[in-house]
Amino acid sequence: MKLSIQRYGSGEPIVLIHGMGSAATAWKPIIPALSKEFEVFTVDLPGHGQTPLDKSQPMDPSSLARLVLLNLSELGVQQFHLVGNSLGGWVSLEIAATNPDRVKSLTGLAPAGLWLAPFTSRYPGELAVRLMAKSLDKVAATTLNYKWAKKIGFETVSPRWEQLSYEICLDAVAAMAKSEGYFPVWDGMLKKRFDKEISADIPVTIIFGDTDHTLPAKTCQERSLAPKHAKWIILPETGHAPMWDSTEDVIAEIMQTTKQCK
């Protein structure tokens, strides 16, 4: 199936892959800086953003990795740097593990899949989160002007929720509300974890926030599952979307990682 992929800037290709229930719009804070150095490709996964859900498309991370690779090949993008958040981080790890000749570097922002005990069922309350986003979508443009609404929607996502821009919040609510692929992706992750090796020739940086309530350190940040050569960073006052909370730090780490490729 064809994925919606947007392009910005010029230079070496760098591919950005969003998380579950999100969309390519999540990358807005870092696109301007990256597009000065790279040709930036932002991907909408199936049932997310501008890519419709295809019920025949397998939604596990390995299958999504193959789908992203196929779409990049069709665009003539053979070698590229990778940046992925949450589910997108897991998909990026799969791409690097299975196609090391195509990946020049990898930066994982709170990547999923690094858990010793895979999930066997969906998180309790996930349906409520999705339903709340759908119910608020039509009024979000107004309600997000109020501090109480912003707090309800983003307090568990970001310790700096008060500082998040109106645009980031509005985009996030819209992405979640429209993410028909949300539960198919959840089900595609069940009973799985990232368990492959990644070539030491590929520079890898893993970044987590110190306040990640979605993938907490105790259960979902198992370093033994990450590449042994990976640089591991914990950013202060940062939640599950480091590119929102620590934008400049994330940009700097991405730049540094890309410069290490051979």
How should these model regions be labeled?
Residues Q6-L53:
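Conserved HGGG/HGGXW glycine-rich cap/lid loop of the alpha/beta-hydrolase fold
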Residues H18-M20, F80, G84-G89:
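Conserved alpha/beta-hydrolase "nucleophile elbow" surrounding the catalytic nucleophile
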Residues S63-F80:
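Conserved acidic catalytic loop of the alpha/beta-hydrolase fold
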Residues G89-P100, L106:
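Short glycine-enriched nucleophile-adjacent loop
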Residues A97, L106-D137:
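Flexible "cap/lid" loop of the alpha/beta hydrolase fold
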Residues A141-I198:
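Conserved alpha/beta-hydrolase catalytic His-Asp/Glu region
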Residues K178-L225:
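Conserved serine/cysteine hydrolase catalytic core
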Residues T238-I251:
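Catalytic histidine-centered segment of alpha/beta-hydrolase-like enzymes
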